[in-house]
UniProtKB/Swiss-Prot annotation:
UniProt keyword list: Cytoplasm, DNA-binding, Transcription, Transcription regulation
InterPro entries: Integrase-like_N, TACO1_YebC-like_2nd/3rd_dom, TACO1_YebC_N, Transcrip_reg_TACO1-like, Transcrip_reg_TACO1-like_dom3, YebC-like
Residue intervals passing through the bilayer: none
PANTHER family in alphabetical order: TRANSCRIPTIONAL REGULATORY PROTEIN YEBC-RELATED (PTHR12532:SF6), TRANSLATIONAL ACTIVATOR OF CYTOCHROME C OXIDASE 1 (PTHR12532)
Keyword Cytoplasm tagged: yes
A GO-annotated cellular component: cytosol
Predominant subcellular localization, coarse grouping: cytoplasm
Location of the region described as Disordered in the Swiss-Prot/TrEMBL record: 1-21
Protein name per the record: Probable transcriptional regulatory protein DvMF_3201
Localization per record: Cytoplasm
GO molecular function: DNA binding
Residues of the signal peptide: none
GO biological-process terms attached to the record: regulation of DNA-templated transcription
Amino acid sequence: MAGHSKWANIQHRKGRQDAKRGKLFTKAAKEIIIAAKGGGDPASNARLRAAIAAAKAVNLPKDKIDNAIKKGTGELAGGDILEISYEGYGPGGVALIVEAATDNRNRTVAEVRHILSKHGGSMGEAGCVGWMFERKGVITLDGGKYTEDQVMEAALEAGADDVRDEGGTWEIHTAVSDFAAVRDALEAAGMEMDSAELSMIPQNTVEVDAETGRKLMRLVDALEDNDDVQNVHANFDLPDEVLAELE
């Protein structure tokens, strides 16, 4: 919608800051560890295939990818990580899903609850907002580098569900099972991806005003700064004036 930016575009802008914080490698490695608990062969483990594809998108070195797989399968120590999701609400009644990877469930739930409360949000019961989201692969590319025909041809032929123009950014949605194949096809076509990850896509979004948007971004930043938090998903559209402040 004109004047507002979707969550994936917000995440893309924030990703430039996240990269500076050096947390992307840790997130990618933890996701591989968790995924590899379901089996160390990506050919028969769709989640591991997707995790490896996302790790490659942030340039995680191959040796770190291999070590993370071995930690997940138990071949190396360090795989004692639990995957937990929390659901709740932020300012303006915005729905939030917080995905964490932790070795201490009690510590993490206490910290997430404290952050939500401090920033005008609240923890909800399991399932309170999860039904509002669908897990998808999301790949973004710079809209100025590639034409619609180039992106559509490479992505849709590889099995992507949808290609969208989100204000100067091409946003590609895939089923989880097709995510790795689409990422590989774009790479083979010589396309440079700004981001490639599994995300929770809201079925509907809520527009917020600038003041609420800033409060929400402070909440999201605080959650993402927590070492145990992997991802934060939300269903709000951010006014462009607030999005510009993320640059």
